Amino acid sequence: MSRWFKSAVKATPAMVAESEEQHLRDVEAAMLKLLNDDIEEADKLLKKHDSSYHHLGRGISGFLSAMMGVEKDLLKEAAVILQDAENKSWDDMKKAQKDSTAFQSNIYPQGTEYLLCYSVAQLTSAITAVLSGSITEAVKGFYKLRKAYLTLDGILEVENKYLEKIAHSSTTSLSSRTPSHKSSMAALTVDEIAHRTADLSVGDLDEKMLDPNNPYPNISRPPSPPSVTNPYDIDPELAARVFTNRTDIFIHSGVRLCCGLLLLVFSMIENPIFNKILYIVGFKGDRERGTRLLWQATRYQNFNSAIAALALLGYYNGLVGFCDILPTDDAADDNPTGYPKNKCQALLVDMQSRYPHSKLWKLEEARMLSYKQDLKGALVILEENSKSKMKQITMINTFEMALTTLFIHEYEKSATAWINCSEQSAWSPTLYFYIAGISYVELYRNTRLSDPAAAEVHKKKAIEFILKAPPLAGKQKVMAKQLPFDIYIVSKVGKWEQRAKAWGVDLVDAIGPSPFVEMIYFWNGVKKSGTVELEKCLDLLKKERMTCPEKCNEDEEDVAIHLLLRGSCCSWREKDLPPGGDSTSGEKMSEKKLLEYRREKLMDCEEKLLKLHSWPQTYVFETRMSFKISTSLLTVKRHKGLMGF
């Protein structure tokens, strides 16, 4: 209640629209300097004043630093700053409604800019709670996210109604809007938007979460196919004419950025606990709407646009690029839920021209080259991009470089890069040391027969780093659960240790099919590999590279791993071969037979994907696989529609 009466305690200067807009300009300039790797100047500008914009800027700066490294101490610090920003923006929102000299928009109710600041602070604060590792804090975080989303959606609704009136008006020019537009929008106040929250308390959430018998529908299903028309599209020309004021642009782009991120992120969640919380708070993601809103946010020369671009490029080059089955037809570039590579390339070029010194865009350029199977080019960029004034960006770059050295079979560089990851990040030391160790395993196998002295050195290093990994498992948790790779690696190394003891050999000599290729497979490096890299993978999978091939071949799990990895490499190596169908004569297949062949393969693909989607048992990498499966199903459904099947 103190928020409501605080203004009555101490008189404060009246708000002046011009001064407030200048604060917005200053903070946007500071945040863009942050993106351009000028950390010191950005920090200096953000501490210069005490406006809501400055408070939020400081909070977002801390939040981005914490998110990039997922460091708990930084998350806690960011949460404190964001709470201050939340309180300040709420107070300013109330004040802006009363001051006649405050900014008045033709589109939004008075004080909406501060309501947006409040919602952004609420949203980012909630994410820090979700990442805290505590289920209780995560539940509170999701509830807060829901409240923030309802507020943002309310602002969107106001805006869309205004745009509909403008779009359908054939007599009123945009340059001289009639008072009726403004008065119709002013009928709804920011208080009414802010209180559009669900009638659900955090206590209700805790109670429902703790009840194991509480039923809820299965909402971890593939997203719906794209609709023919989309009510959330805005004509770019209309938007350019309507949104000319800096504060209006801040609201317009900011709402789209936040709503788009929420809808996109929650459409990808397949974790059962997360899904249960989302269902209880009444939240459902929407991948298509989320991506469309983010693309709309990229149109403007401001910080919101840059973050929307980062989100889109990260989503497409990271998550979507991680998937195997994606649209490849001529219209694929216009499909927001596939991989629109031409749009992504154009967006990257635009952002690099705006922020030429930013390490983030170089990182995305390297990811894009990896997607195009130019791993050497990606590695060159990452090596040149290895130093940033923001240590979190350096850490992400190091991680990306470590993955690239893994995919390109640079074993020495791979070991070094993963050890560097362990020094720069505390997120998953088990994974970092394990991959460093298996990099030395391949060096050992390369020299085991040809150079025994060198092999012995590599063997010792392999054993050292592999055995370092299991004791560090469980240091980081999400929703009180261990990371999937931690669980898998502990099990894997434990099996090798038991074998080594039973067979009377060193740990490295008890290892079966290449764990190096296995990690390439898990991180979808097979898809990013060219013919040379795929041939190297197949070489590493040769049975004679193992010290004890006969004993390993008696293990069903090892045999299955070998066949899976080999099959995956062969499949990608031969993906461009023409379809053979049922013809063995070598004659060209008729159009009718080719269509039948494609239909048969498409239906078979869908059947297998649906079987995977409804797999009855849980497994360690279920969450990683779920997004790939749902994206593949979306692609298959789309292709069936295009083919008329």
UniProtKB/Swiss-Prot annotation:
Keywords: Cytoplasm, Nucleus, Phosphoprotein. The keyword Manganese does not apply. The keyword Cytoplasm applies. Its main location: cytoplasm. Interacts with lipid droplet proteins. Belongs to the IML2 family. This is Inclusion body clearance protein iml2. The lineage of its organism: Eukaryota, Fungi, Dikarya, Ascomycota, Pezizomycotina.
